[in-house]
């Protein structure tokens, strides 16, 4: 892949003498530096500890205060990037238009973040997609595209509801009223396991909290999450 996936410019790859002596495999870039810089990283030092939203200082945002008032323990989501216009364009091309090449843009970074939890003994549970989306529209789970060869557990499946309105087509109020969309299909007892939920975007948190509830009901000791964007 010699051209940037986003702008089409020729990709340059500088190899230092130290790199050659390291005998490490050559990681080929898929986007140019100019395009990569357009995506705004979230600074964990000044993000909401509940959802990962970028804040001016480390404090709980109003959305997360609402979850606490509703009786939920915060999921402590970590998000890598802001969900701004450039990220929306990326998600549209990858997730909704089904350009599977776009998984490479964030795959390495996403896998490194998830691997941090895996090394701490967390079971990795991706948020599933419904069968209709998988078979008729996209043909892949966008989260699994980023995760690559990382071992995952299929503890959750999407309840089949033909013609249901997808989350991406709902406004905030409709999202918050969404009923439990998942079924738990894992072990009879999760035996105090630590679980890392993995999803693409944290919007209202409704999807992740639904998943968290099922896993806790099945015996999970602790459930947290990582998303690409917030």
Labelled PLM ranges:
Residues 1-230:
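Glycine-rich phosphate/pyrophosphate-handling loop used in enzymes and phosphotransfer proteins
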């Amino acid at each position: 892949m010699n051209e940037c996936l986003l702008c089409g410019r020729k990709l340059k790859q500088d190899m230092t003498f130290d790199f050659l002596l390291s005998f490490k495999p050559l990681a080929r870039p898929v986007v140019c530096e100019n395009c990569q810089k357009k995506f705004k990283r979230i600074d964990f030092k000044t993000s909401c500890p509940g959802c990962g939203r970028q804040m001016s200082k480390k404090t709980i945002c109003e959305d997360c205060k609402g979850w606490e008032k509703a009786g939920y323990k915060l999921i402590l989501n970590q998000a890598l990037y802001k969900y701004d216009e450039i990220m929306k364009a990326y998600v549209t091309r990858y997730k909704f238009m089904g350009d599977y090449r776009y998984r490479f843009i964030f795959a390495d970074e996403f896998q490194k973040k998830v691997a941090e939890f895996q090394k701490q003994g967390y079971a990795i549970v991706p948020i599933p997609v419904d069968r209709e989306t998988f078979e008729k529209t996209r043909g892949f789970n966008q989260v699994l595209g980023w995760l690559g060869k990382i071992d995952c557990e299929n503890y959750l499946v999407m309840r089949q509801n033909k013609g249901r309105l997808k989350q991406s087509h709902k406004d905030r109020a409709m999202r918050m009223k969404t009923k439990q969309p998942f079924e738990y299909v894992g072990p009879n007892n999760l035996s105090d396991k630590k679980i890392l939920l993995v999803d693409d975007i944290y919007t209202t948190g409704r999807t992740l909290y639904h998943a968290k509830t099922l896993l806790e009901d099945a015996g999970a000791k602790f459930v947290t999450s990582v998303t690409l964007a917030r």
